[in-house]
Amino acid sequence: MLQKPKSVKLRALRSPRKFGVAGRSCQEVLRKGCLRFQLPERGSRLCLYEDGTELTEDYFPSVPDNAELVLLTLGQAWQGYVSDIRRFLSAFHEPQVGLIQAAQQLLCDEQAPQRQRLLADLLHNVSQNIAAETRAEDPPWFEGLESRFQSKSGYLRYSCESRIRSYLREVSSYPSTVGAEAQEEFLRVLGSMCQRLRSMQYNGSYFDRGAKGGSRLCTPEGWFSCQGPFDMDSCLSRHSINPYSNRESRILFSTWNLDHIIEKKRTIIPTLVEAIKEQDGREVDWEYFYGLLFTSENLKLVHIVCHKKTTHKLNCDPSRIYKPQTRLKRKQPVRKRQ
């Protein structure tokens, strides 16, 4: 349970109204919401308006303040379909002026509450300032950030760099564990990794929508899709988010994980340490370990719900731990002419 109450915006599925609710736990917010909307608490649950993710007590602390939630009763479902609409619309580079005007007209004429809600949500999401890039173009997006960040791409690039740097700091804490004899080799490997990371700008391009296609994890408009748990090929829930769209999505994106498929702390670093200790004249393939630790070769971008914290039980490839040893060809003796 949180010490300080978290404030959220809450709506019921079939209600045009939206209320502010505060609570220290998911259950407290649910109880207050049911009282407010006069709905039965039994069988009811909360989910994110953004993508339909169901809230649990473990996930509740990660939800940003003023996040928009939907209160569902038994049998109701919310798929976050507006996200799919928004993703489709954002594929166009020009503002959807005609579409906005048409939706506004439909909203004026529409009497059915559910259709009114859908049209209102559509207008809200189409009107978001996704295309804006600078602080001057979208000041609310930058609220709470240091003044040195003047562009959305710049901040998100920094955010990704910070994650990669934290992995490097973790590796850097291990030289003392390998013993005096192997420390020099460990520092050599670490130095090579640092040099590569600096040249790649700590792979910050992964979160930069302005980067080249092969070096970013999002669309040119800034849409990220969850790549699914480490043991699956894709995300069955089709989680997606655009942290470039608004401040709330930017904050929510910070809860997404860059998950190591082969685990960093349990497997990769211990294997690297052991390889350096036991190299016996062989050369450790630092580029292989670099790829596992710092690149999308072994990193998956996942929604917090798809981030499984169980032991992955995956190992490094034994054939790639050391560089192949080159054998010198023996010179054939020169035959004497008869």
UniProtKB/Swiss-Prot annotation:
Query: Domain CIDE-N: where?
Result: 4-80
| Keywords noted in UniProt | Apoptosis, Cytoplasm, Hydrolase, Nuclease, Nucleus
- The protein's Enzyme Commission number: 3.-.-.-
Q: Name one GO cellular component term.
A: nucleus
- Ways its activity is controlled: Inhibited by DFFA (DFF45).
The cellular location(s) given in this protein's UniProt record come to:
Cytoplasm; Nucleus
Major localization class: cytoplasm
The answer, when asked if Membrane is one of the entry's keywords, is no
Please list the GO biological process terms of this entry: apoptotic chromosome condensation; apoptotic DNA fragmentation; DNA catabolic process; negative regulation of apoptotic DNA fragmentation
Q: Name one GO molecular function term.
A: identical protein binding
Q: Which SUPFAM superfamilies match?
A: CAD & PB1 domains, His-Me finger endonucleases
**What does the UniProt function comment say about this protein?**
Nuclease that induces DNA fragmentation and chromatin condensation during apoptosis. Degrades naked DNA and induces apoptotic morphology.
> Could you give the subunit structure recorded for this chain?
Heterodimer of DFFA and DFFB. Interacts with H1-1.
Q: What is this protein called?
A: DNA fragmentation factor subunit beta
Gene (UniProt): DFFB
